[in-house]
Amino acid sequence: MKTINKESIILASGSPRRKELMTQAGIDFKIHVADIDESKVDPGMPAENYVCLLSKTKAQAVAAHYPDAWTIGADTIVAVGNTILGKPAGHRQAVTMLTQLSNREHSVFTAFTITRPDSDDLITRVVNTRVRFKALSKDEINWYADTGEPYDKAGGYGIQGIGAFLVKEISGSYTNVVGLPVCELIDALASLGAISFKEVK
């Protein structure tokens, strides 16, 4: 596959959705999952600050292992008002989250940080996509929770999977909801010289 890399890129995430999005964008990269304790980050802080801090922490933790590469850390959360919804731990929590999201609008925040140890350059961007669910019946909520899809996803749903039927409207970046705002990421990587669309002669 044709790639757009000029320099080595590391993805500090084990998310299969981020892996797929970056591959589709033509980025050649390696994966090194960040080993951090997310519970130490205060969930009471504003959603944008919370997700930016996590993306930066992940990027810096992995970047230390790759002095000559650009490292990308990312994190996605769902917020309803001032309440941050993480990944449901089980069926009951998934049902609770889906009930909260039913027939209302919520925000999906994804932040990414790009850094490298041998450079002073560090970019953090956060993108907010507004998503509205249709009114969900109890049967729909329980059926979807039983599919198992909600359990590794912020907010308890996957817009790119079975959970697409939950979504009535979306305003903003679709890939941001999946897990990585590709348009903004490409622009940031290009501004750092990590990628280029010019043909290499």
Regions found by a protein language model. Name each.
Residues 29-30, 197:
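A local structural micro-motif
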Residues 4-27:
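N-terminal beta1-alpha1 ligand-phosphate binding loop
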Residues 23, 41, 142:
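A short local structural element in Rossmann-fold oxidoreductases
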Residues 3-10, 44-201:
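Anionic-ligand binding patches
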Residues 14, 34, 117:
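Cofactor-binding loop segments of dinucleotide-utilizing enzymes, especially the Rossmann-like FAD-
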Residues 38-39, 48:
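Catalytic cores of phosphodiester-bond-cleaving enzymes
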Residues 30-38:
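A short beta-strand-loop structural module common to alpha/beta enzyme folds
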